[in-house]
Each structure stands twice: as structure tokens, then as C-alpha cells.
């Protein structure tokens, strides 16, 4: 059994939606990133990679590599799951906390869970996503960006 933690942040930029957990959410800003900016999936990738002692997302998908420009982060997550399996591990469960003042996450959480479960090849009951604000404190409270913490439990195949 292995446990990993992931954390990622993206700042807001020009745009009219954010993608979180593979779900497109209307918003008055987008997220600045080399890929599609799915900060939730990036944190999950790091948690999975960390649990398997495989480094981090930047090592596997560097933002200097043009192949990953604008890439759908679901593709990255699926690749990470394959790497983890090659090392003899399977996902036991994942849990993530989105830290954002806006947009409101509650209407989108279940679709995020379903999308993530599909990519992880696990049941939706093995995926938890929740959201909180910082009561208008810090960069997320000032609506400058979104942060996500994620943990993953891996079990031997």
C-alpha cells in the first residue's frame, strides 16, 4: 500500500471557462497553463506519481515540450494510470480538495467524480472531490487562481 500527495495551482487568465476534473465550467476567466490547465487532474497526477515513487507531472510532461501544448489533461491522467500499473500498483481511492472562491463547484462535483473514475478505471465510490473557499483570504480568495490538494492510495496488483 502506498499514499501520495499532489498539489497544483493555476492563475486565472483571459477566457470564459475553466476545466476541472475533465469538466468544462463556465466562468469569467480561464486558467493560464501550457496544457488545458485542469489543476484538479494535475494534482491527482502528482498524487499518483508520488505514491508510486515516479516523480512528478513536470518530469513526465514538461511545459517546455510542445507535444503537451493545450493537451487534454485527461490524456495525461490516463498515461499516469498506465505508468502506475506498470509498476505493479492500482488505485485504491483518491480524494481531492479544490480551493477556489469562484466559480461555484457544487453543481459540477458529481460530473468530475464520474470523469475521474472513468480515467482511473475505478468505481465512482473510490473518487471524492470537494471544494472550499478561503473566506476571501489569499490568492484564491482574491480570485487570482485555483489551487487543489489531492491524495491517492495505491494498492498492489
Curated annotation (Swiss-Prot):
Instruction: Give its E.C. classification number.
Output: 4.6.1.12
**Could you tell me which pathway this protein works in?**
Isoprenoid biosynthesis; isopentenyl diphosphate biosynthesis via DXP pathway; isopentenyl diphosphate from 1-deoxy-D-xylulose 5-phosphate: step 4/6
Q: Where is this site: Transition state stabilizer?
A: 34, 133
What is the documented function of this protein? Answer: Involved in the biosynthesis of isopentenyl diphosphate (IPP) and dimethylallyl diphosphate (DMAPP), two major building blocks of isoprenoid compounds. Catalyzes the conversion of 4-diphosphocytidyl-2-C-methyl-D-erythritol 2-phosphate (CDP-ME2P) to 2-C-methyl-D-erythritol 2,4-cyclodiphosphate (ME-CPP) with a corresponding release of cytidine 5-monophosphate (CMP).
Question: Which enzyme type, at the first EC level?
Answer: lyase
State the family named in the UniProt similarity comment for this chain: Belongs to the IspF family.
Catalysed reaction(s) here are:
4-CDP-2-C-methyl-D-erythritol 2-phosphate = 2-C-methyl-D-erythritol 2,4-cyclic diphosphate + CMP
Q: What is this protein called?
A: 2-C-methyl-D-erythritol 2,4-cyclodiphosphate synthase
Cofactor(s) needed = a divalent metal cation
Q: Does the keyword Metal-binding apply?
A: yes
**Any one Gene Ontology BP term:** isopentenyl diphosphate biosynthetic process, methylerythritol 4-phosphate pathway
Binding annotation for 4-CDP-2-C-methyl-D-erythritol 2-phosphate: 8-10, 34-35, 56-58, 61-65, 100-106, 132-135, 139, 142
Highest taxon listed in the record's lineage: Bacteria
- InterPro entries on file: MECDP_synthase, MECDP_synthase_CS, MECDP_synthase_sf
Gene symbol of the encoding locus: ispF
Segments spanning the bilayer are none
Instruction: State the UniProt keywords alphabetically.
Output: Isoprene biosynthesis, Lyase, Metal-binding
One family name in Pfam for this protein: YgbB
Answer whether the UniProt record assigns the keyword Lyase to this protein: yes
Q: Which GO terms describe its molecular function?
A: 2-C-methyl-D-erythritol 2,4-cyclodiphosphate synthase activity; metal ion binding
Identify the SUPFAM superfamilies for this entry. IpsF-like (SSF69765)
**Organism from which the protein derives:** Azotobacter vinelandii (strain DJ / ATCC BAA-1303)
Amino acid at each position: 500500500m502506498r499514499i501520495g500527495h499532489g498539489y497544483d495551482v493555476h492563475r486565472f487568465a483571459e477566457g470564459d471557462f475553466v476545466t476541472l476534473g475533465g469538466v468544462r465550467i463556465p466562468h469569467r476567466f480561464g486558467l493560464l497553463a501550457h496544457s488545458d490547465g485542469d489543476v484538479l487532474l494535475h494534482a491527482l497526477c502528482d498524487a499518483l506519481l508520488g505514491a508510486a515513487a515516479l516523480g512528478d507531472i513536470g518530469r513526465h510532461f514538461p511545459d517546455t515540450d510542445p507535444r503537451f501544448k493545450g493537451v487534454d489533461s485527461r490524456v495525461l491522467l490516463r498515461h499516469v494510470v498506465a505508468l502506475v500499473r506498470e509498476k505493479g500498483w492500482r488505485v485504491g481511492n483518491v480524494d481531492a480538495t479544490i480551493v477556489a472562491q469562484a466559480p461555484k463547484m457544487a453543481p459540477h462535483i458529481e460530473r468530475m467524480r464520474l470523469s475521474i473514475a472513468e480515467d482511473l478505471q475505478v468505481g465512482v465510490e473510490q473518487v471524492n472531490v470537494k471544494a472550499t473557499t478561503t473566506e476571501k483570504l489569499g490568492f484564491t480568495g482574491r480570485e487570482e487562481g485555483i489551487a487543489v490538494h489531492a491524495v491517492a492510495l495505491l494498492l498492489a496488483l
